């Protein structure tokens, strides 16, 4: 074995899982291991899995199988790791299996099979912000783990546990390190961002703590107010529509955090929402959306929905289409209901046939596409702040405040010299054209 052991790493799943991968990679680098992006020459391979839906489980199992075939020494972690028996039935030769956010256990297993190397102070230095898998100009910041909801289509609590919020000072310290390292955009993630600190006692929630000499309370609003002082873009994801979310909108209107709200509404039929164990009155939701836009006209609303949930009738589905038309959401994701092993909804009666799910999915997307086209057309002629993600011989590709990386649209700018700008720079672009999802503009 060479002086510095090589660890191969595969990261699957959502941004929350990506943050877990970054934490493990940071621990590996701190311990002196070399991280490589291939099976060849790796002394061990770690696979951080996803287990949210059956297709993700299959992808994870295939990734583990490939790692075993190409390398032979594999440690499995992540959401699917919570189902050890399921993994070992398919891949009995896996060395060790841990559940999600089991950083210490993963490192113990690595040390067991690949002893920790002697540290060289000149080669094993880890940047203050840790190892990041995202481009240097943006990063995901996870503020809590787990979830207290018991949605019938979801098994996240069984894999990641109940809500466990990080201390606010710890979050803010990490955010400042990231900003100091050059990060221009922080994407705040968790299973339920708006529930931040609600798992703590009222005494702890109301307790005054100090950060940078400023007294703050332990809640989401205070967290956002302090993140705003960093002078970078702050984007909120996975914001469950609790009443106190209304208090975030003035911060967006004042330019303290991005006017972008990612709220997973899931459906519009009261019957289906009840079956999903999701709260909320659609009439009240529409009223709140109207109020939010009155306070913050530039607000971008993103949401996700499920079609073909067990018991969904044509009438239920039509309610969803009517809601889309009335709500005029900016960015929307749609998923066909997928059975998940262990989820209550998987065993429900009145399962919707696959061909019906497919047909409803396409109808849903047609309605939302028309809405998206109309809303993006309204941006033509406006000048928007754009953060640059890529620069090539054709121009630049960036994102506006309305666009999160990977899941939303982009802005193309071609009348600009490569030497005039840098990746991560925020520039002003005048929009000249739009299609269903993307914008074009001039600098």
UniProtKB/Swiss-Prot annotation:
Record's subcellular location: Cytoplasm
Stretches assigned to coiled coil: none
Annotated PROSITE patterns: MTTASE_N, MTTASE_RADICAL, RADICAL_SAM, TRAM
Occurrences of domain TRAM (ranges): 377-443
EC number of the protein: 2.8.4.4
Binding-site positions, [4Fe-4S] cluster 1: 14, 50, 79
All copies of domain MTTase N-terminal, residue ranges: 5-115
MF term (GO), any: 4 iron, 4 sulfur cluster binding
GO terms under biological process: tRNA modification
Keywords from the UniProt entry: 4Fe-4S, Cytoplasm, Iron, Iron-sulfur, Metal-binding, S-adenosyl-L-methionine, Transferase
Enzyme class: transferase
CDD domains the UniProt entry points to: Radical_SAM
Cofactor: [4Fe-4S] cluster
Record's catalysed reaction(s): L-aspartate(89)-[ribosomal protein uS12]-hydrogen + (sulfur carrier)-SH + AH2 + 2 S-adenosyl-L-methionine = 3-methylsulfanyl-L-aspartate(89)-[ribosomal protein uS12]-hydrogen + (sulfur carrier)-H + 5'-deoxyadenosine + L-methionine + A + S-adenosyl-L-homocysteine + 2 H(+)
Domain Radical SAM core: 133-374
Family membership noted in the UniProt record: Belongs to the methylthiotransferase family. RimO subfamily.
NCBIfam families: 30S ribosomal protein S12 methylthiotransferase RimO, MiaB/RimO family radical SAM methylthiotransferase
Function according to Swiss-Prot or TrEMBL: Catalyzes the methylthiolation of an aspartic acid residue of ribosomal protein uS12.
The name this protein goes by in its record: Ribosomal protein uS12 methylthiotransferase RimO
UniProt source species: Haemophilus ducreyi (strain 35000HP / ATCC 700724)
Lineage: Bacteria, Pseudomonadati, Pseudomonadota, Gammaproteobacteria, Pasteurellales
Gene this protein is translated from: rimO
